Every structure is written in structure tokens, then in C-alpha cells.
Amino acid sequence: MTQDKILILDFGSQVTQLIARRVREAHVYCELHSFDMPLDEIKAFNPKGIILSGGPNSVYESDYQADTGIFDLGIPILGICYGMQFMAHHLGGEVQPGNQREFGYAQVKTIDSELTRGIQDDTPNTLDVWMSHGDKVSKLPTGFTVIGDTPSCPIAMMENAEKQFYGIQFHPEVTHTKQGRALLNRFVLDICGAQPGWTMPNYIEEAVAKIREQVGSDEVILGLSGGVDSSVAAALIHRAIGDQLTCVFVDHGLLRLNEGKMVMDMFARNLGVKVIHVDAEGQFMAKLAGVTDPEKKRKIIGAEFIEVFDAEEKKLTNAKWLAQGTIYPDVIESAGAKTKKAHAIKSHHNVGGLPENMKLKLLEPLRDLFKDEVRELGVALGLPREMVYRHPFPGPGLGVRILGEVKKEYADLLRQADDIFIQELRNTTDENGTSWYDLTSQAFAVFLPVKSVGVMGDGRTYDYVVALRAVITSDFMTAHWAELPYSLLGRVSNRIINEVKGINRVVYDVSGKPPATIEWE
């Protein structure tokens, strides 16, 4: 690869991948590697600059140290949160526990510097930022000056202008920091001098070559769910190896309404991809009977998928690889980032739900891409825009949208309710004519295994409850609940209650992420 590159050393922050996303938004190629990446590998990577991520640990813990030789490479370095503390500690400054943790919004007063010049928010020389730290730099290393402070953090930003070393105690990668993108662009484009040459067509060329090299003449099986991730993965792999790819479409009884027909029409008939359609509803439902724990459900669904693939593998002479549409947010939510130092939230079906004795090797061509990049890739590969920009759908399907035990009755009710919700979102527009489906990033219905009392006509009902969930997000790492019009919510509720026999109450989820996750399980 001849284009300019930025290296991100990951110390285990839950939002480290957002740094990579922001850098790529500037069309500069970057890679995220573990903080303990050997110095000779860093030199071989030949980055234009290095970004040190945040992390949950202390600089005084010996297990969380990068090679300090990075400070002798003669290239710009930006330390974020823990990365700033690591920089200060190893260059002769001091880091101490703060008297109080600083978490959330803060206003930083800035001093003119190469990093901050011309970047400000509503008032001169101030930045509205997002803090999340306990320790802080208490004494500057030699050669550094303060370029930003808050009342509780006198050294919130620091620089060594001569060496082009910068430290910031807040997180520019999250959307809560208003000028975060501008600060990162200043570092990457201006200070590091990286040229913006990374695009999806370039990525396709590199990814295709990598898949061909990795797979060789082996055959590959991919579980095609109809979701964006698996669909784009299928198109990319098919571009690379053609008929060596066989997609297995598993109907586990937990798909959206008419999902099976849509998938077969698109891939088998229109794109010429080999697709095996497996009806495994009975197998999955039997295994899930009586199981209420969401982690167990995820692992059961993952294990059953492998059983299905094993059965199909026996029919394919050279099948060696299982392809998946795993993307960055899947990995970070499972604490599966390359450092494995992030604090775990929950397992993901593409990461933690696979049995250790899986017989196939894993092929994950989208593992380093964010959702918006996956969509951009899908369009570049020629997939229909309406498919590529379809809302995300989890691999376990409705299995993680039915709280508690999964039953066919529940799945049938939820399918109908969810379809009504999506129909109304597509058919309702804002004042600019944009549908609420396009205005929201993800929307779906959740089945609650509780009954409530209702009245229909002259009779009393005692039926189930569904919750509606709609969020707006740029990265799926954080999300805000969508403020849907009351009239839209009213129509959805009326239709579900009147058209879906067995549901008599509809509620709307107004939780953000954090503290909630987007999916309920």
C-alpha cells in the first residue's frame, strides 16, 4: 500500500474504533493495533503519525505500556485521555489520580497552538468537549506547554510544538465533542501531512486481493441473513472468488416478514450467487425452548448455525472457510478489539457465540469497517441502494428481540408488528419530504412476554405488549432515541393493535445509548 497511513495504538477504550472512523472520514487510511505492537512492526508500517487511544487503566500498571521508542521516530503523535497520560509519564511529566472523576460535558479554555488555531465553539478560545477520566497530568514533561485547561483539569491539553507531540484529556472521537472532527483533521491532514487518498473503490481492490490470497482455491460458506452486513460481505467475496462462494440462507424461524423470498430473489436470481436455502425453524425452536438468558440464546443460535454449516460443508469438497459479516461495532461490544483490554458489555453472535471446536476457518472481510463504510462499499459493489441502506438486523434475528423464551407464536406476532412499524416509517415524511425510515438509523419492534389488560369493543382483552425502538446515530457506538411524531406513533399503535391479534398494547422506548444498548438483548 503506497498511500499515507495513520497508526492508532489501542489501550482498550470502548470508543477507540471511533478514532479510526474519524480518520477514515478524512479519506486517510489508518489501522488500529494493540498498544504493545513491536517497534520494528511500527517502523515497517511507516505511519505519517501515531494516535494513542484512551483506556480504562493507569499508567502505573506495567501491563499497559507501549514501546517508548515511538517517541524517537520523528513523527507527530497525538495522545488521547490515557494516551496523553502515557505520553506525559514516559517523557518526564507526572500523572496523579484526580480528586474527582470528570465524566461528561466540559468546557476547555484553549491557547493558540498549531493544533487548536482557528478551532473553537460558541465563544472565542473555548471547546465544548466530552471528558471521561480519573487520573490526570499534574506536571508537564520538559519542552511541553499547556494549550487547554478546565477548572478541574489545569492541564487538559498540552503540546511540544518542536516535536509535534500533542496530548488532550478529552475524547475528540465522540460526537459529543463538537469540534472533535476538526481537531483530528488538523492533526491528521495538517500536522501529519497525510494525503486523503483512501476511498471505497481502492478498498475493494485491496480487499479482493486479500481474500484471494487468504482463501486460495478453497470453497467458502457464508450465512446469508438478508441484513446489510452479510449481504455486502457476500457481494465482496463473490467479486473476489466467484463460484467458490456458496451462501447458506438459514430460515431459523426468526427472520423478518417475507425475508426468505427477498433474499433468494436478490442473490440467487438477480446476482447469480450460489445460495442453499435451509429450512431449520424446527431445529432452532427446539434448542431455544425454555431458554430465557440472552447470552445463552445467542450462543445457542451461533452453535446451531455452525451445525447447519457443518451439514452443508459435507456436501462441498473443498469447503474450508466460514465467512461472516462481522464489523467493528460487533467486535468492540464484545471486548473483542485487538488489545482485548476493553471492558466487556455483551457477546455478539459473530464473536462470542461461536463454539471453540468450529471446524471451519473464519473469514471476516468487513471486520475493520464501520456501518456507514459497509453501506458505501455495498453501493460501490453494485448492490441496490434500498437493500444497502436497510436498517441493521442482528444475526440471531428476532431471537434477541423476543425477551425471554423464544416461541413460534411470539415470533409470528413480532414479525407482523415489526412490519407495520417499518411500513409506517417508510410512508411518513418530515417537512422536507424525507421518510422517517431514512431519518432513523435503526428501528424495530420488541416482543415483551408479559400480558396487559385491554378493552376492545365491549369485551376485555388480556394480550401481549410490544415495544417500539427507533434510534438516530452516526456510528452505532452511541445513539439517541428518535423523536418520532406523535401522529406516526399513534398510527403504528392503532394498526398493530387492530391488525395483530394477540397484541393489545404498544409502548415506545426513549432510552439512549449509553446507558442502554440499541438492542434490548
UniProtKB/Swiss-Prot annotation:
Pathway: Purine metabolism; GMP biosynthesis; GMP from XMP (L-Gln route): step 1/1. Residues 198-390 form the GMPS ATP-PPase domain. Residues 5-197 form the Glutamine amidotransferase type-1 domain. The keyword Protein biosynthesis does not apply. The keyword Ligase applies. Pfam families: GATase (PF00117), GMP_synt_C (PF00958), NAD_synthase (PF02540). Gene3D superfamilies: 3.30.300.10, 3.40.50.880, HUPs (3.40.50.620). SUPFAM superfamilies: Adenine nucleotide alpha hydrolases-like (SSF52402), Class I glutamine amidotransferase-like (SSF52317), GMP synthetase C-terminal dimerisation domain (SSF54810). The active site is at C81 (nucleophile), H171, E173. ATP binds at S225, G226, G227, V228, D229, S230, S231. Homodimer. This is GMP synthase [glutamine-hydrolyzing]. It comes from Neisseria meningitidis serogroup A / serotype 4A (strain DSM 15465 / Z2491).
